[in-house]
Amino acid sequence: GFGKTKKYSDGKKVENIEDLFFEFLRVAEDIKPKVIVAENVAGLMMGEAKQYYYKITNEFEKIGYDVSSMVLDSSHYGVPQTRKRVIFIAVREDVTEAVGLTFMNIAGIFPDKFSEAITCGDAFSDLEYDEEEIKMLTEKFSKGSHFETASKMPKDPDKVLTGCDYHPKGHHFNMKRISRHKPAPTITASGGCIHWSEMRKLALCESQRAMSLPDD
């Protein structure tokens, strides 16, 4: 688990953070589990936001945990989506002492990357589509503000394309044309990803596959 730090997604310093971090630490201190696995946005390791990262590690140590962290990308571990998160592994100090764990031993717990990433083409290859949903998505997209920009983006690209590169004023940064040859970019609540060859946003079943969720 972990507290929300949405405002640190891009690594910028923000005052008056609205997150659950201290509540999370309070619960951890009360329960005192042997091991804590926590995650947060990768932006926590960037720029001025890194001050908050150091605060997190210091707080873990204050309540009696040896902690190690690493930025992992879900596309390296069998998920057809690029999603970077900083993962914390904290082990209670009495446990590390009892079994002879060191900081380097804890860091070695993080998994090795898979040899090959799963592409969108691989992940979507056997999907059964709801034709009514596809029709609705296509019609809705054709009437939306992103249609003109999307029409300028090449179809079936070798890599993920970003809308701002095809908008005269650099707008539509969050719109991405996915590539069937690559994992999807990070799926967001705004649903900014569009199909590699069709003029529509991703269908529900495609988004589920990109997030490695079960079809049902």
Model-derived segments and spans:
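Short catalytic/ligand-binding loop motif for oxyanion handling, primarily in non-cytosolic enzymes
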Residues: 1-4, 44-47, 78-81, 96-98, ...
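Conserved proline-anchored active-site loop of SAM-dependent methyltransferases
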Residues: 1-6, 35-41, 88-90, 187, ...
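Short glycine-enriched, charge-decorated loop/helix-capping segments at active-site entrances
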Residues: 6-15
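Glycine-centered helix-boundary capping/hinge motifs
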Residues: 9-10, 32, 64, 212
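Conserved Class I SAM-dependent methyltransferase catalytic core
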Residues: 16-82, 86-91
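S-adenosyl-L-methionine-dependent DNA methyltransferase catalytic core
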Residues: 59-62, 85-216
